């Protein structure tokens, strides 16, 4: 599949405007197709980014960390089913084996995966598995809590529903006490 040109993408937006009953040549909509394409370039900038590159700078520490937890990383993504936004928070914990990364790197990983068409379940796994693969910690725990526009703007029209997904690797998957501690910490907000 070849990537459409910017002009083809802009024309597709004009076609969608016509489809919903709008006139793309009216004054308020003249620049809308270009604005939509510019927005999409930014919103979906996670494609082509390499998580391994982000996690390249590691700190090899001799101190013995019990665990490392970063809570409340905010994100907005778009569901691949309706191309509507879902937004929420990501909590990440890992138990280092011999290296750690700066905390901003974890937020950058979230942004890479959030800036793609997604489903929350897959994004949860992608974040956890990328930390596991690149840092090789004893275990990783990831929890995502999000509100989905596809539930609030259409269909069942439930605007207060929050979806929670979790994924565990290593010691978090193997030992309940680590999962329990992680879930207790994430629930205290």
UniProtKB/Swiss-Prot annotation:
<feature type="binding site">
    <location>
        <position position="150"/>
    </location>
    <ligand>
        <name>Zn(2+)</name>
    </ligand>
</feature>
<dbReference type="GO" id="GO:0006730">
    <property type="term" value="P:one-carbon metabolic process"/>
</dbReference>
<keyword id="KW-0547">Nucleotide-binding</keyword>
<dbReference type="InterPro" id="IPR001474">
    <property type="entry name" value="GTP_CycHdrlase_I"/>
</dbReference>
<dbReference type="GO" id="GO:0003934">
    <property type="term" value="F:GTP cyclohydrolase I activity"/>
</dbReference>
<keyword id="KW-0862">Zinc</keyword>
<dbReference type="InterPro" id="IPR018234">
    <property type="entry name" value="GTP_CycHdrlase_I_CS"/>
</dbReference>
<keyword id="KW-0342">GTP-binding</keyword>
<dbReference type="InterPro" id="IPR020602">
    <property type="entry name" value="GTP_CycHdrlase_I_dom"/>
</dbReference>
<dbReference type="GO" id="GO:0005525">
    <property type="term" value="F:GTP binding"/>
</dbReference>
<dbReference type="GO" id="GO:0046654">
    <property type="term" value="P:tetrahydrofolate biosynthetic process"/>
</dbReference>
<keyword id="KW-0378">Hydrolase</keyword>
<dbReference type="GO" id="GO:0008270">
    <property type="term" value="F:zinc ion binding"/>
</dbReference>
<comment type="subunit">
    <text>Homomer.</text>
</comment>
<comment type="pathway">
    <text>Cofactor biosynthesis; 7,8-dihydroneopterin triphosphate biosynthesis; 7,8-dihydroneopterin triphosphate from GTP: step 1/1.</text>
</comment>
<protein>
    <recommendedName>
        <fullName>GTP cyclohydrolase 1</fullName>
        <ecNumber>3.5.4.16</ecNumber>
    </recommendedName>
</protein>
<feature type="binding site">
    <location>
        <position position="79"/>
    </location>
    <ligand>
        <name>Zn(2+)</name>
    </ligand>
</feature>
<dbReference type="InterPro" id="IPR043134">
    <property type="entry name" value="GTP-CH-I_N"/>
</dbReference>
<dbReference type="Pfam" id="PF01227">
    <property type="entry name" value="GTP_cyclohydroI"/>
</dbReference>
<comment type="similarity">
    <text>Belongs to the GTP cyclohydrolase I family.</text>
</comment>
<dbReference type="GO" id="GO:0006729">
    <property type="term" value="P:tetrahydrobiopterin biosynthetic process"/>
</dbReference>
<dbReference type="GO" id="GO:0005737">
    <property type="term" value="C:cytoplasm"/>
</dbReference>
<keyword id="KW-0479">Metal-binding</keyword>
<dbReference type="InterPro" id="IPR043133">
    <property type="entry name" value="GTP-CH-I_C/QueF"/>
</dbReference>
<feature type="binding site">
    <location>
        <position position="82"/>
    </location>
    <ligand>
        <name>Zn(2+)</name>
    </ligand>
</feature>
<keyword id="KW-0554">One-carbon metabolism</keyword>
